[in-house]
Amino acid sequence: MPLAALHDDAPRRPRIALTLLAAAALALAQAGAHAATDKLLLTGGVTSVDGAAGGGLTPWAVIGSNATEGEFGVAATASVVSTRNYTMQVRGLLLAYDDRYEVTFAQQDFATEATGRALGLPGLHLRMDILGAKVRLLGDAVLESDSWVPQVAAGVEVKDIDAGGLKPTLQALGAHTHGVDYYASATKLFLAQGLLVNGTLRMTKANQNGLLGFGGTGHDTYKLEPEFSVAWLANRKLAFGAEYRRKPDNLNPSLLGAGLKEDDWYDIFAAWAPTRNVSVTIAYVQLGHIVPAVATNKQAGGYASAQFAF
């Protein structure tokens, strides 16, 4: 199927949401940089690639930042994922209130590198904006750690993808450039054992998390996909864990046969919080096949993220 020979140089859409969140984040950080907090290190998770508090690949029921009951909090993050054929950079902002409400904004910049060149689109970047919201519904992972009731939260992620010269191909495949994910998460902290477990159910139409649009011809309904995380708190500043995220396979088969087959994601990570306001995460990630019609190898690689929270 011929691809439109367009260049990925269209003007970026105005980042109104990011500007508002950045202004609010700066004000909150200045106001609360020296405020005391009772929140235990790392129990608020880190920031996922979609912007929500949790692990690197999946949201948890925890609320991000250092805010506790009655407090406002803010967190900013920058991440990079590098695999055999692709590189993705992520930046995000998170606002929280009362350890119950969370609003996030993330931007993903996915460099297609050799795959873009093979498709006749050299220099192609897939850019996605993600506006998210989460609310804690019941439980408290820390204060009620002696109870069997987990902390439970529900969230939404509104995603818009700027596919540049790939947009005509996505349209031919029946994929949309706008989508909404809905999820519910349950997080249980076994404080005495230093063990945290999380389960998430996500309703989604996303192809490769939305980077290849949403849905496809004959596959335009929501799928319910499970996600799991486990983390061991080795001490108050260091955690090790793993995540698994099942994903739909809407573009397999397609006009390209199995050339857009999609696999599940997983990672093995280590998170370190040298101070109350800073955390660093590194991980080995396995993202499976991404456009195997061109990039035939599975996309394994590294993930690194830095988060600043107040």
Please describe what each predicted stretch is:
Residues 1-46:
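Cleavable N-terminal export/targeting peptides
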Residues 10-12, 27, 133, 185, ...:
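Short alpha-helical segments used as structural interaction elements across diverse proteins
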Residues 35-174, 178-182, 187-195, 235-238, ...:
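Transmembrane beta-barrel domains of Gram-negative outer membranes and organellar outer membranes
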Residues 113, 208-210, 214:
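Surface-exposed beta-strand-turn/loop segments characteristic
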Residues 168-177, 201-203, 212-221:
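Short, surface-exposed, charged loop/turn segments at secondary-structure junctions
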Residues 191-205:
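A structural motif
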Residues 212-220, 224-310:
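Outer membrane beta-barrel transmembrane domains
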